[in-house]
Amino acid sequence: MFFFKGVVAVLSFFSAVNAAPFMKPNNGTGKYIPDSYIVLLKRDISHDDFELHKRWASDVHKRDVAKRGISFSGIGHSWATGSFRGYSGVFSRDTIEEIMKHEHVAHVERDQIGTSQGWVTQPKAPNWGLGRLSNSNPGNTDYTYDEGAGGNAVVYVIDSGIDTMHPEFQGRATWGANFIDKNNVDCWGHGTHCAGIIGSVTFGVAKRAAMIAVKVLDCNGQGPYSAFIAGLHWATEHAQKNGHIGRAIINFSLGGDNSPAVNQALEEAQKAGIFVSAAAGNFGSDAGSITPGGARLVCVIGNSDERDYRWTGQGPSNFGARVDIFAPGTDIMSTLPGGGSGVMTGTSMAAPHVAGQAAIQVSISGGGFDLSVACAFFKNSASASVKNPGPNTTNKLLVNGANGTKGPKQDENKPNKPPGQDEQPGQNKPPSQNPPPGQNPPPGQNPPPEQPAPSPPANPGDEPNPDGQPYPGDQPNPGDSGPSWWMPSGGLQPPAWWNRRPSFGGWNRPMWWNRPLSVWKL
């Protein structure tokens, strides 16, 4: 998972005269981009007022640049989804102070960059996570799932991109938007791995779901919060314009220091009717203290291992009241760019399991499943539990209702085989092995008593403003109460080639294509 290791402390609000609140990082290892800001406007302004404000801000910026004789790029991304309106940009100190004073501005924060927390741990391993979804007890590697396999759902993967040419995706993965560079390739691998868990033929939960790549991370696994917001806005708007609402899902395996701006963008997507599955984070600390756990409406997913323990090894799963449910996320085999596969561990791998199951529910219902209550549905129907969830944390573990699990209901009388692949010999899972010392306990042993994990390490200090002055917002103003949202109280059709008779681009449709259900041994 991609996270800024740290917790943002929200200082008292700074203002000159009715200035917007400004959130400054107090500690943490987040990388803050010089002179780069995210600006949110008040919810009650009209679209016309928003456009007028942007023109005004651009004029202020141009005048200041001309006066100073220096170069700042000004407004970059902007977004307007429902009542969520704002923009990001690179501004001088004087310009951002003028913007903060404007009557329409609700919040300003500095833009920042995060890095990867996922890693490949071994070259080859069986994917146990699918079998865990459809069986009452751990250890069974048969994966039983509904015949629809997510075929009328669309999943937006907001990440490092997707290798859309990977044969595991069978043409169901496409490029949507790129907010980080001009290269529509996944040069980091994290997004392709997440997409494979969602919908690849071999490793995926929903083997017929469509996936759309929204790239917000570069080849080093880094991306600014402003790109995260732009990606969320694009996905929400795309789903609305293309009739995907009610069938649309977002996988958000990203995060970091708590950001009201990113949290609000996540909540706006959920309010629009899109189910958002978000990774809880890999710090072994309270998920509610960071983004996306600070977004109250999204479904926050913790990482469980093969023995149904919360993962407490390297990159331990976060816990706390904002974790909604656990899902498999430890040593998960999935797709990698270039047609390959590999293993990663983290809540980044857990969230796509839930996104994939949401796609399955869409296909079970024929598009009539209410995605706004999907998270509660998964929690209430979970029959499995995590043995050491952590302080003040649910123990619910995702299941899909097959083979005697309680879970979301489906027709359990039909056998099931995945589209695109017959059962392969030699794929059965080898006997489980005990983890290395210091990781989760082997079967038959109780876990150590739960202790709240320490907070992420503190940053030695926030970098100084290049002009030698404090950043706007460094001085508190106890009188500012903050914005009102600070304490938040049509469908996709299968592609034309799907029902095409014997061939597609030289690829012959196999005999199992129209079979109802199958059982796949991993």
From Swiss-Prot:
Prodomain positions: 20-117
Disordered: annotated span: 383-515
Signal peptide boundaries: 1-19
Which Pfam families would you find in this protein's record?
A: Inhibitor_I9 (PF05922), Peptidase_S8 (PF00082)
Q: Which residues form the Peptidase S8 domain?
A: 127-405
Primary localization: secreted
Family recorded in the similarity comment: Belongs to the peptidase S8 family.
Tell me which domain of life the UniProt entry assigns to the organism this sequence originates from.
Eukaryota
Q: What's its EC? A: 3.4.21.-
Question: Where does the UniProt entry place glycosylation sites?
Answer: N251, N392, N403
| One CC-aspect GO term | extracellular region
Q: Where does the record say this protein resides? A: Secreted
Query: What Gene Ontology terms describe what this protein does at the molecular function level?
Result: serine-type endopeptidase activity
Function of the molecule: Secreted subtilisin-like serine protease with keratinolytic activity that contributes to pathogenicity.
Answer yes or no on keyword Nucleus: no
Biased region (Pro residues) positions are 432-459
Where do the catalytic residues lie?
A: D159, H190, S348
> Compositional bias (Polar residues) spans?
383-397
Protein name in UniProt: Subtilisin-like protease 10
